[in-house]
Regions:
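N-terminal, charged/glycine-rich beta-strand/loop interface patches
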Residues: 1-87, 92, 99
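Solvent-exposed residues in well-ordered beta-strands and their adjoining turns
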Residues: 42-44, 76, 103-105, 139-141, ...
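Short C-terminal domain-edge/linker segments immediately following a structured domain
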Residues: 54-55, 71-73, 81-84, 104-105, ...
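Acidic (Asp/Glu-rich), glycine- and aromatic
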Residues: 91-99, 104-129
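A structural signal for small-residue-enriched, beta-sheet-centric alpha/beta enzyme cores
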Residues: 116, 120-172
Length: 172
């Protein structure tokens, strides 16, 4: 089930009955300062699902107010999830924190990505102010197998450094 501001669109099976494709729609159109959004995704034994979004997620500039999105994914034994949302666009002056935790049981498989675009580059906007913080944790049977923390401040030298983004506005 889903609760506002999220809505699941009708599931479909373009690959046949073996894997269900689901699209999560964020009906508000974007995430603003002081928003706190939570997603809890639970796949039962032997489930096979691909989850995506219909469009990029927009993180609006917030005058310092923090927006938070928390995604918790639990996959039971032999479950399979492809978590492939469209990109996240972090507008200039946004203050955004995302936490994702994936819990895997025996033989469960998760494939996922997060593609982040800093600033609305099609408009020439750069991410010169604000903060972006991302936590990703993947656990199998209560043991960590991957823990990653990423943090970018607006106008950070890492946006331009060769050991950073090298002047490119996208990471993923």
């Amino acid at each position: 089930f889903s609760q506002a501001p999220f809505k699941f669109q009708n599931s479909f099976y373009p690959e046949g009955k073996s894997i269900c494709h689901s699209v999560i729609l964020h009906t508000a159109g974007g995430i603003a300062g002081d928003d706190i959004l939570s997603q809890n995704i639970h796949l039962a034994h032997n489930s096979k699902v691909l989850i995506t979004t219909p469009a990029a997620t927009k993180i609006y500039g917030s005058q310092g107010k923090k927006a938070i999105q928390e995604v918790k994914i639990k996959l039971e034994k032999d479950a399979y999830l492809e978590y492939l949302p469209q990109e996240i666009i972090v507008f200039n002056s946004a203050n955004f924190k995302q936490k994702m935790r994936v819990d895997l049981d025996d033989n469960a498989c998760w494939l996922g990505w997060e593609i982040i675009r800093f600033g609305r580059s099609a408009r020439g906007e750069i991410f010169s102010e604000g903060n972006w913080l991302n936590y990703l944790e993947i656990w199998r049977k209560n043991k960590p197998i991957w823990i990653d923390r990423q943090y970018f401040m607006g106008n950070s030298p890492l946006f331009y450094a060769s050991n950073g983004l090298g002047g490119n506005p996208v990471v993923g």
